[in-house]
Amino acid sequence: MKNRIKKGSSMIGVYGRSDGSSSIQSSNGSESRESIDDNKQGHQSLVEWLNETLPYLNLPWEASEEELRACLVDGTVLCNLLNQLSPGSMRMGGSFEPGCVNIERFLAAMDEMTLPRFEVSDLEQGDMIRVIQSLKALKASFSDDGYDKNTLSARRRWSLPADHSKGVDSNFNDGGSQFIEASEINTSHHSLQNTSTRSLFDMLDRLLDESSQKMNVSHVYVSILRGIVQVVEQRISNQAENLKNQNILFRVREEKYRSRINVLETLASGTTDENEVRRKRCAPNRKGKERSNAELSKLKQELEIVKETHEKQFLELKLNAQKAKVELERQVKNSELRVVEAKELEKLCETKTKRWEKKEQTYKRFINHQTEALQELKATSMSLKHDVLKIGENYFLDLTYYGIKLRGVAHAAKNYQIIIEENRRLYNEVQELKGNIRVYCRIRPFLQGQNKKQTSIEYTGENGELVVANPLKQGKDTYRLFKFNKVFGPESTQEEVFLDTRPMIRSILDGYNVCIFAYGQTGSGKTYTMSGPSITSEEDRGVNYRALNDLFHLTQSRQNSVMYEVGVQMVEIYNEQVRDLLSQDVPDASMHSVRSTEDVLELMNIGLMNRTVGATTLNEKSSRSHSVLSVHVRGVDVKTESVLRGSLHLVDLAGSERVGRSEVTGERLKEAQHINKSLSALGDVIFALAHKNPHVPYRNSKLTQVLQNSLGGQAKTLMFVQINPDEDSYAETVSTLKFAERVSGVELGAARSYKEGRDVRQLMEQVSNLKDMIAKKDEELQKFQNINGIQKRGLSKLRIVSPPRRHSLGGALTNSPRRRQGPGLLGRTTSDIHRHQNESRSSSKFSGGAKDNNIFEDTELLGFEESNNEERLSDISDSCLSMGTETDGSISSGAMELTLFPETSNPPEMFEQSEQNDKAHVGVGPSKPLKHTPKPDISKPSRLSISTTSSKALTSSKRPVTGISSSVKPLNRKR
């Protein structure tokens, strides 16, 4: 044992890296073997060996695997352990390197020493068995039993790189035979790294002696000297680090042993058995202390050597300091030059200071002059102050006088506001008496994604003023002013819009006819105002539902005095064709009786689903047809049994659109053309009504025919003008507002209520009976015409004009059994025509005309002579409908409804209306002018009716047959 310690200490003395560590390992190995024998070679022996090798760890003897893992996981302890066992073998990196790099270095060293290794994952989160086995193998390899030549050679190969040994060998081969020691080192398998320090110094002495003798040193010698010096320097530096570590180790061990001795001394008063055990435990510690003292003395000697090296380094630092002093002197000279420059700048500053002093004197003189001027101004201001006080007193007197006058003006202003409200009320009453079409303008808010766009709406007033701005023009042409009955801003709700229309809608129950229609470009919110985006949401419901809901509440509140019946029709005008939206299997427009709001919701849902809707660039849900919701109300007074009839037409017009912006093609282009055509026809009608032209072109479109009684009759009419505030739609907005301005100037006449008593109903029944008798006589006349052969020629021409099938709006009336036998309005209109034929025939007899001529005239009236007679008959029916408004506007409205939307079975309440129509139309004259003969006193027709129908007959003979009067087949809707 002592020989091994001496061997290890001798190797440390000659600075051998592997030898120096072997003595520590041998001593540690003996201690570890003793601890293994004491603890049965368990886990505690490994922990004790680690604490002894690296004292700063201070691991507890009973440390668990997790504590051991936490100590070894960063790899620093492993690398320090290997450096402690073999000093200088591991080069530690900086603190910035991760722990896995140190672990990889340790594992690479274990592979070079051919020792069992472990994986990085085992140390991080795996089983610690392989780690413990690897550490035990490392411990055994550096112990006394494992200290053999193979292990030593393996450690030496691991300590010195192969390229370095090869380089040194090559340098020694170039040395020649002059140095036997160098050649011997080269021929051996050991490098300079494995040579002892003493031999290296001897070799250096011999080289120096040889060089001093010959004074001729070759490159080989120089390289050898450099290699020797580098190895010596490296060993000395490593040894210094080892000395520091060992010194710390010895101090820690000494403190540890002292603490143990103190503990043992305090426990000496215990039992003898415990003292014996403690003595046994302290015995190896004492031996270790003796060994450490011996090692400490050796380390002190080595420390002196290191001290000499530090003195050499101090000399070098002193030389460097001298060089730095020279550099500092050079910098001092530069600073002196800068001081000279600073003095020159100081002189320059002095000259500038003198210049500023001169300026200061001039400024002082100027200030003194200004001070004198200010004193003069002060005296002047004092005089002005006295004048101002006098003027203030005068103003106070004037203000008190004007205040007294202003009180009277304020009192007059209050009365002026009352007068303005009264004038506004009277103006509305005058407008209602004149029958002007009311125009409400509603501005659609910006949609999502359009908030950043600039608006073309400049101002909206409370009294219906609207100012729009043209973004493309500047100056006085930028703004345009329009005035309407009401203007709703983008923030207005559906409830606010309906509250202004409620009084007009409620007048239906009093027997008035009301029409509300929405006009504007596509995507401006017409359908939103009339129907709403969702019927299920009460806040978003439009005028249609709110109007019907309000009517139901009124009918329920008045049910004790008046019994009401409400019927609903909903149609659309699609491509100049009328379609029923509430039923598809009925050829004509169907009337549906409703009794509650639930019925209305169901019907409106059906109508909205059946309505034609398409997507365009401007609007994803663009309405491609005009929607008409007609509400017919019939009320019977419980006491007087008088009948009230009113109708409400809620029209949602399709939006006008520019093909260039909407980018429609194909079927959508055709729809847009029909929509624009019908809206253009509506504009022509408005233009004619505004200028009070004698001829109004209602027949140019199905839309104008539907709105004929609302625009030209004595009904209450309201138009919603929907506009888009986007500046890109400025042209469409101005066009829409101009149209609305023309509409607001149309006078319809005072609206009248339709109310008939019991006597009127009896007279109408008598008239209907007389008409039935006339119809029978007309049939006998037709048989007589067939006998004379005229029927054949008339039928052939009729076949050319129009096939015998169901007619559409304004078409010629066929002589079908249903039309002939039914008591409706159309059959009675035909009987009126035959009655006029009889009157014409009787008048021709008084004039002495031929019988054949009368027959031909009757044939022309029936439509068997000329192709344009079909239109003439429709003109006669239109004249009957329009002229009836002279006596009662609601009668013509009901007649128009039945003419446009005939039903398979007319409701009973419509019979009385048709009888009243017949009574009003008794005086309608023939469509073709007769010969100038005195007329009998059988009937006295109205002058206005005769003149109007005769003028229509004259003009219709020159016009070609239009598509409006042609018959159409029942519509097959394709969705």
Swiss-Prot record:
Biased composition (Low complexity): 17-30, 944-958
Record keyword ATP-binding present: yes
Database matches in InterPro entries: CH_dom (IPR001715), CH_dom_sf (IPR036872), Kinesin-like_fam (IPR027640), Kinesin_motor_CS (IPR019821), Kinesin_motor_dom (IPR001752), Kinesin_motor_dom_sf (IPR036961), P-loop_NTPase (IPR027417)
Sample GO molecular function, one term: microtubule binding
Biased composition, class Basic and acidic residues, residue ranges: 31-40
Keywords: ATP-binding, Coiled coil, Microtubule, Motor protein, Nucleotide-binding
Pfam families the UniProt entry points to: CH, Kinesin
Residues involved in ATP binding: 520-527
Residues covered by the Kinesin motor domain: 436-746
Listed CDD domains: CH_AtKIN14-like
Coiled-coil positions: 289-345, 757-788
Disordered: region residues: 1-40, 801-852, 900-975
The Calponin-homology (CH) domain, residue ranges: 40-143
GO cellular component: microtubule; microtubule cytoskeleton
Any single biological process term in GO: microtubule-based process
Record keyword Nucleotide-binding present: yes
UniProt similarity note: Belongs to the TRAFAC class myosin-kinesin ATPase superfamily. Kinesin family. KIN-14 subfamily.
Stored PANTHER family: KINESIN-LIKE PROTEIN KIN-14K, KINESIN-LIKE PROTEIN KLP-3
The protein, known as: Kinesin-like protein KIN-14K
Species the sequence originates in: Arabidopsis thaliana
The organism's taxonomic lineage, starting at the top: Eukaryota, Viridiplantae, Streptophyta, Embryophyta, Tracheophyta
